[in-house]
């Protein structure tokens, strides 16, 4: 092998080692977004639920600001229950069907069914309650105590 080839091989190996240290992204968030779209018939962009109230988005604390935020708190609690069962809700991919009445789970494993049920219940809840623009991107340190 030529020295240039060895350097290239070394560079590839080092970059792969670095990539293995990157934590995986929550794989089912894109799937959850599709379940939400199915439930609300595409009325609201999915990213609007990523930073709403005290519980919609990463983390969560305090008292939910409204019923929609309460849907997110319940979803967080459902994911916590899934973790207690040994499931990985943010990484679990599942099978669902989008029917005229909304999403339905048809997953095979217990973890897939549990996580899918969490997501479908949350998506149905989102579709049921109004979205208040004043609760998007709020100051959580002041309003979520």
From Swiss-Prot:
- The principal localisation class reads secreted
Q: Where is the active site?
A: 75, 119
Give the disulfide map: 38-98, 54-144, 56-72, 71-125, 78-118, 87-111, 105-116
Q: Name one GO biological process term.
A: arachidonate secretion
Q: Which Pfam families match?
A: Phospholip_A2_1
Q: List the SUPFAM superfamilies hit by this protein, alphabetically.
A: Phospholipase A2, PLA2 (SSF48619)
Gene Ontology CC terms: extracellular region
Which cofactors does this protein require? Ca(2+)
Question: What are the EC numbers?
Answer: 3.1.1.4
The protein's annotated catalytic reaction(s) are: a 1,2-diacyl-sn-glycero-3-phosphocholine + H2O = a 1-acyl-sn-glycero-3-phosphocholine + a fatty acid + H(+)
Q: Which residues form the signal peptide?
A: 1-21
Indicate the residues removed as propeptide on maturation: 22-27
Give compartment(s).
Answer: Secreted
Instruction: List the Gene Ontology MF annotations in alphabetical order.
Output: calcium ion binding; calcium-dependent phospholipase A2 activity; phospholipid binding
* The keyword Signal is annotated on this UniProt entry: yes
The record's remark on the cofactor is:
Binds 1 Ca(2+) ion.
Keyword check for DNA damage, yes or no: no
Query: Which keywords annotate this record?
Result: Calcium, Disulfide bond, Hydrolase, Lipid degradation, Lipid metabolism, Metal-binding, Secreted, Signal
Tissue spec:
Expressed by the venom gland.
Please give the PROSITE patterns that the UniProt record associates with this protein.
PA2_ASP, PA2_HIS
Question: What exactly does this protein do?
Answer: PLA2 catalyzes the calcium-dependent hydrolysis of the 2-acyl groups in 3-sn-phosphoglycerides.
- In Swiss-Prot or TrEMBL terms, this protein is called Basic phospholipase A2 P'513
Originating species: Laticauda laticaudata
């Amino acid at each position: 092998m030529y020295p240039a080839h060895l350097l290239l091989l070394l560079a590839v190996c080092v970059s792969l080692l670095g990539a293995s240290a990157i934590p995986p992204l929550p794989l089912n968030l894109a799937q959850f977004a599709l379940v939400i779209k199915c439930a609300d018939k595409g009325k609201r962009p999915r990213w609007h639920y990523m930073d709403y109230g005290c519980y919609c988005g990463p983390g969560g604390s305090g008292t939910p600001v409204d019923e929609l935020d309460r849907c997110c708190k319940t979803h967080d609690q459902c994911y916590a229950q899934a973790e207690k069962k040994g499931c990985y809700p943010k990484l679990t991919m599942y099978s669902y069907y989008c029917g005229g009445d909304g999403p339905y789970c048809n997953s095979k494993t217990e973890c897939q069914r549990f996580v899918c049920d969490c997501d479908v219940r949350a998506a149905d809840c989102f579709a049921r309650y109004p979205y208040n623009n004043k609760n998007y991107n709020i100051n959580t340190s002041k309003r979520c105590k």
